[in-house]
Swiss-Prot record:
UniProt name for this protein: Putative calcium-activated potassium channel subunit beta
Topology of this chain in the membrane: Multi-pass membrane protein
Stated family: Belongs to the KCNMB (TC 8.A.14.1) family. KCNMB1 subfamily.
Function of the molecule: Probable regulatory subunit of the calcium activated potassium KCNMA1 (maxiK) channel that modulates the calcium sensitivity and gating kinetics of KCNMA1, thereby contributing to KCNMA1 channel diversity. Increases the apparent Ca(2+)/voltage sensitivity of the KCNMA1 channel.
Transmembrane portions of the chain: 20-40, 167-187
Chain coiled-coil ranges: none
Sample GO molecular function, one term: potassium channel regulator activity
Gene this chain is encoded by: KCNMB1
Carbohydrate attachment residues: N89
Keyword Transport: yes
GO biological process assignments: detection of calcium ion
Keywords: Glycoprotein, Ion channel, Ion transport, Membrane, Transmembrane, Transmembrane helix, Transport
Originating species: Coturnix japonica (Japanese quail)
Length: 200
């Protein structure tokens, strides 16, 4: 009687472990799918892939520009901010090009090197942009990214999704997938040895 209870408890534990392993594998596959349709397209779309050295030629704050709080919005709620324009000398080609913060900056406003968030306080934004401009004048040489294919003649300061960041994004689903597969394999091995011991 005790042996039957032990066998029943063992089978329940194996079933739960197997469900856990399958659940981890399923969750990891969903995470892979989510990353594949959200982050990977942005990474492959970016053409600024080669790192080089940029030297600041001029960093000026132009007249205030504006951006709407949402694309296609008919509201008159418009956010104004100083337009910072940074021009640099691209070491790789010797050209004078405009610097943008990230790939997203160019899409949001190609006239400005930095675009703040819409919900930020205007005074804080003005102070931050002035600080950024002074930092560019203080630190005139820094690494930047350019398009080796020549499709984009401008450069960016940092990539939204660099290769290391993309690998780190895939790390957690990979660990979950590996752990789930390991649990399933261990359960199957346990079941195999249980069958062998039952035959003896």
């Amino acid at each position: 009687m005790l042996a039957k209870k032990l066998v029943t408890a063992q089978k329940r534990g194996e079933t739960r472990a197997l469900c856990l392993g399958l659940g981890m594998v399923a969750c990891s596959m969903m995470m892979y799918f989510f990353i594949g349709i959200t982050i990977v397209p942005f990474y492959t779309k970016s053409v600024w892939t080669t790192e080089t050295i940029c030297k600041v030629l001029k960093a000026n704050i132009k007249d205030k520009t504006h951006c709407t709080n949402s694309e296609g919005s008919e509201d008159e709620d418009i956010f104004h901010y100083p337009c910072l324009q940074v021009w640099v000398n691209l070491t790789a080609s010797g050209q004078e090009v405009m610097l943008y913060h990230t790939e997203d900056t160019l899409e949001r406003n190609p006239k400005c090197s930095y675009v703040p968030g819409n919900s930020e306080n205007s005074k804080e934004v003005k102070a931050r942009i002035e600080t950024i401009a002074s930092n560019f004048k203080k630190y005139q040489t820094f690494p930047c990214y350019y398009d080796p294919g020549g499709m984009q003649t401008n450069v960016i300061l940092s990539r939204l999704y660099p290769p290391k960041g993309l690998l780190f994004t895939f790390l957690w689903p990979t660990l979950m997938f590996t752990g789930g597969c390991l649990i399933i394999v261990l359960v199957k091995i346990s079941q195999y040895f249980s069958v062998l011991s039952a035959r003896q």
